[in-house]
């Protein structure tokens, strides 16, 4: 486990910070990485803490600015552009993994599952901003590093996706996964 005091542990992160995470520079050489663009599904993290959220065990809030030229609008679907729902789900997993690195967890992050996902709206190229909110329910930070969280995706003020029991683990040895 990395000493969180040696990390660049802040309560918010810019796009440049997130790019540094994708290169493995933010949480140290053994810390988890975010994916690089175009799979990086957020532009900034605006709030992180270890005691907030619906369960008092941690909270992450991030934003994605919607631009009509985002890669998925050109192919999903031609003539009927919509952000794939799986990308919103992946963004929530990305943020759980980011949180695990933020608290000092080490290893390569992998999504391990989700309890239930509900879609009640869509993200169109006319939207302006997506907000992701992650409410940590349980964090294991020992030899096994794992986070369990609930999440939601909001577009322009309306919650359109919810997910329960988002599970992400950090692995030291990928041969066991």
From Swiss-Prot:
Q: Which InterPro entries match?
A: FabA (IPR010083), FabA_FabZ (IPR013114), HotDog_dom_sf (IPR029069)
> Which GO BP terms apply?
unsaturated fatty acid biosynthetic process
Provide any one GO MF term from the record: trans-2-decenoyl-acyl-carrier-protein isomerase activity
The residues responsible for catalysis, as annotated, are 76
Q: Where found in the cell? A: Cytoplasm
Q: What is its EC number?
A: 4.2.1.59, 5.3.3.14
Q: Write down what this protein is called.
A: 3-hydroxydecanoyl-[acyl-carrier-protein] dehydratase
Please name the source species.
Answer: Mannheimia succiniciproducens (strain KCTC 0769BP / MBEL55E)
